[in-house]
Amino acid sequence: MSKSENLYSAARELIPGGVNSPVRAFTGVGGTPLFIEKADGAYLYDVDGKAYIDYVGSWGPMVLGHNHPAIRNAVIEAAERGLSFGAPTEMEVKMAELVTNLVPTMDMVRMVNSGTEATMSAIRLARGFTGRDKIIKFEGCYHGHADCLLVKAGSGALTLGQPNSPGVPADFAKHTLTCTYNDLTSVRAAFEQYPQEIASIIVEPVAGNMNCVPPLPEFLPGLRALCDEFGALLIIDEVMTGFRVALAGAQDYYGVVPDLTCLGKIIGGGMPVGAFGGRRDVMDALAPTGPVYQAGTLSGNPIAMAAGFACLNEVAQPGIHETLDELTTRLAEGLCEAAQEAGIPLVVNHVGGMFGIFFTDAESVTCYQDVMACDVERFKRFFHLMLEEGVYLAPSAFEAGFMSVAHSMDDINNTIDAARRVFAKL
């Protein structure tokens, strides 16, 4: 047995499923998950000594690559001053100033510890501000594991074949209305059925939890218009897309102005950080200035703030997003060319530093139904053969891939060459 296999066997006796987040267990592809020893740049190194070109990037945060010196040094320096104070720090102010400067639609921002906390808190705030209970989300979109959001969710819920989770009371779920991503007609129908009851729409501007599904040109502006028409708030979940699709997020890339924005992943530079923010009048409803309660023992933790501050300053440097786009475009085009040579039907969606691989005869993948029609069994074989080639992709057909600026063009070309060999075996 390999060291990963031994560790996984031990872990399953102590940790449910052997992992602390379900998709890591390789449930969606089968086999034994890799246990990682270290990471640097674009590479992961497992406990058995094998190196992999990494396109998971810790599920999105590692836009600069692993073990970036600016982030590592910031964490070390902050740790020398203390790990947690439970009181305000200067770095929280600096971090809030940086985030609101980078994302102009955020007049104010509240730091939390995860993307789930950010979306959960933003929805509570929207409900409190509007005095309404219902929310709209979209099939296949995942916004964390808060009870009200585990309805036709994507990501790990799809990987496990459970779009709805046991343990979520029907009384909670009844306030969550589910519409079809990229379909404004379904959204209007929900508003017309409940014209005075919908507090907000929450949407991934690029659906990254049913792999990678970009919005159609009219979709996000249409959501903004419907929210304005019916008096609801628009919450854009930029946990994946924030600082990745563009410096100011997908909202800037697609030209839509939300009322609230949720952030995570890149904002922490690899540390557990989330944030939500937006219009000043809405944020003023949040405790302690307003009646909507939200709190966190470790929110604004000095180590995490130092990591995030260092990361965002690096991400804001000129040329970062152009590099991400160039690398991702080359990968997507190269994979499609290699698949075509082998007679394998393939669609690769990509936006900025995100991409999604779909084994499908369809010309495009634009919604949940398109994703569910893809060949998951072929993806499983592709995943394991690529792993043997030293390429680490997301271990699920329903998870997006992530590029970093630490990837070189040689890494991309080597990945395409590996895929060419793999396609010949599929």
UniProtKB/Swiss-Prot annotation:
Its EC number is 5.4.3.8. Keywords: Cytoplasm, Isomerase, Porphyrin biosynthesis, Pyridoxal phosphate. It comes from the Bacteria. It is found in: Cytoplasm. Its cofactor is pyridoxal 5'-phosphate. The modification N6-(pyridoxal phosphate)lysine is found at residue 265. It catalyses: (S)-4-amino-5-oxopentanoate = 5-aminolevulinate. The keyword Transcription regulation does not apply. GO terms for cellular component: cytoplasm. Pfam families: Aminotran_3. Gene3D superfamilies: Aspartate Aminotransferase, domain 1 (3.90.1150.10), Type I PLP-dependent aspartate aminotransferase-like (Major domain) (3.40.640.10). Pathway: Porphyrin-containing compound metabolism; protoporphyrin-IX biosynthesis; 5-aminolevulinate from L-glutamyl-tRNA(Glu): step 2/2. GO terms for biological process: protoporphyrinogen IX biosynthetic process. One of its GO terms (molecular function) is pyridoxal phosphate binding. SUPFAM superfamilies: PLP-dependent transferases. Homodimer. This is Glutamate-1-semialdehyde 2,1-aminomutase. It comes from Salmonella typhimurium (strain LT2 / SGSC1412 / ATCC 700720). The gene is hemL.
